[in-house]
Design a protein with these regions (language model features):
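Extracellular TM2-ECL1-early TM3 structural module of rhodopsin-like
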Residues: 17-22, 53, 58-127, 131-132
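Seventh transmembrane helix
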Residues: 256-277, 289-348
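Intracellular signaling interfaces of 7-transmembrane GPCRs
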Residues: 47-52, 116-141, 223-256, 312-341
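Helix-to-loop junction signature of class
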Residues: 2-4, 22-25, 66-83, 96, ...
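Extracellular/lumenal N-termini and interhelical loops of multi-pass eukaryotic membrane proteins
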Residues: 1-14, 156, 160-199
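Extracellular N-terminal segment of 7TM GPCRs
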Residues: 1-38
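Fourth transmembrane helix
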Residues: 102-183
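Class A (rhodopsin-like) GPCR signature focused on the TM5-ICL3 interface and adjacent 7TM helical core
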Residues: 107-119, 158-167, 205-242, 259-279, ...
Length: 362
């Protein structure tokens, strides 16, 4: 897709690298847009956008959709240079970074909502939840959702205002076109140190800092929530007498999502974080840097796709467990899991078929 006129601006080996990055970025961004759009469409058609369980995932998918569109636009603009490409690329990349940070925060927000949902299900089986507690949790959730949109925008205001006023976009697309190397806020060219150059340099490191710090905070928050959720899940296992099989299927689905969404988050952004750190420490012409560029193009643009896969797979597992649980309704009086374990323990060891029929779902 790259035009011959662009060859002059790229060093020999880097021209091939950026051409490969363009195709990788285009493909992964397209898949991410399709994946996030499918979750959004599913939530809308099921009329579940306002559901407390679906709303955080809807906003996370919306952020992934806009992020994928930014990646897609960058890949397309790489092969179709315009007269104001430097200005467009600079602001497109800054816009993309808003959605990077928003995606981090919405992932934390969704993981927290999953944990709260798990905790409320646990408490509801032990004691009745007061309406005040439910309203309080709902209010906190709305504040977190609004903050996840507002904070990234406010963080990037200096990049838009100071960067454009200081002409930091000059020669911005000279090397990499409009491919979104998300940690690469424009550095000034070889020129005497001026106030404008100092501002651009500050914006460069500010952009990297915002990305790395927001990722670190989000990652720590997710680890804390994950550890709390695992402890709560163990309490569920030890209190199986309170749960029927259909309830247990729901608990298992929520617990899986608490685990797999953070894993998808880390897989998507770990190469990009390493790339941002390397840009501050070593030359950007090293082979490690080149490898991370390719790995980043494969992972960072794919969060919408991975989130869609996680949601679809956990939903499939939930429906499968629920169907298995419903078989008791057609054959016998439904049993609690503790009752099934008791009856299973009283069966002789020589009856594997009967034992298999009374085993727990896990």
């Amino acid at each position: 897709m790259a035009l011959p006129a662009e060859a002059a601006r790229l060093d020999g080996g880097w021209q091939e690298v950026y051409s490969a990055l363009q195709w990788i970025q285009f493909t992964m961004a397209m898949l991410s847009v399709i994946g996030s759009s499918s979750i959004i469409a599913y939530a809308i058609f099921q009329n579940a956008v306002r559901s407390p369980e679906v709303r955080p995932l809807f906003y996370l998918s919306l952020s992934d959709l806009f992020l994928g569109m930014c990646w897609l636009a960058g890949a397309l603009l790489y092969s179709t240079p315009t007269s104001k490409q430097d200005l467009i690329c600079y602001n497109l990349q800054a816009t993309g970074q808003i959605f990077y940070v928003a995606s981090f925060l919405y992932t934390v927000n969704y993981t927290w909502h999953l944990y709260v949902d798990l905790k409320m299900k646990y408490n509801q089986n032990l004691l009745r939840m007061s309406p005040q507690v439910v309203d309080y949790v709902s209010c906190i959730g709305r504040i977190a959702t609004i903050s996840s949109s507002l904070i990234p925008f406010l963080l990037m205001v200096p990049v838009f205002c100071l960067g454009n006023s200081s002409n930091c976009y000059q020669n911005f697309s000279q090397k990499h076109g409009c491919l979104l190397m998300h940690t690469e806020i424009a550095m000034p060219t070889n020129e005497p140190q001026t106030l404008s150059g100092s501002v651009c340099r500050a914006m460069h490191f500010y952009g990297i800092g915002v990305f790395l710090v927001s990722f670190l905070i989000s990652f720590i928050a997710i680890l804390v929530i994950l550890s709390q959720a695992r402890g709560l899940y163990k309490r569920f296992v030890n209190s199986t007498g309170f749960l029927g099989d259909q309830q247990w299927a729901m608990i298992k689905m929520v617990e899986q999502r608490v685990v797999f969404y953070p894993i998808a988050f880390f897989c998507c952004w770990a190469p990009a974080v390493l790339l941002g750190i390397l840009k501050l420490t070593i030359s950007t012409n090293s082979k490690i840097y080149m490898a991370l560029l390719i790995l980043q193009a494969l992972t960072a643009a794919s969060q919408g796709l991975l989130n869609c896969i996680v949601y679809g797979w956990t939903q499939h597992v939930f429906l499968s467990l629920k169907r298995n649980a419903c078989r008791d309704v057609d054959t016998q009086t439904p049993l609690l899991r503790s009752q099934k374990k008791f009856y299973a323990s009283t069966l002789p060891a020589s009856t594997p078929d009967a034992e298999g029929s009374t085993s727990t779902l896990l």
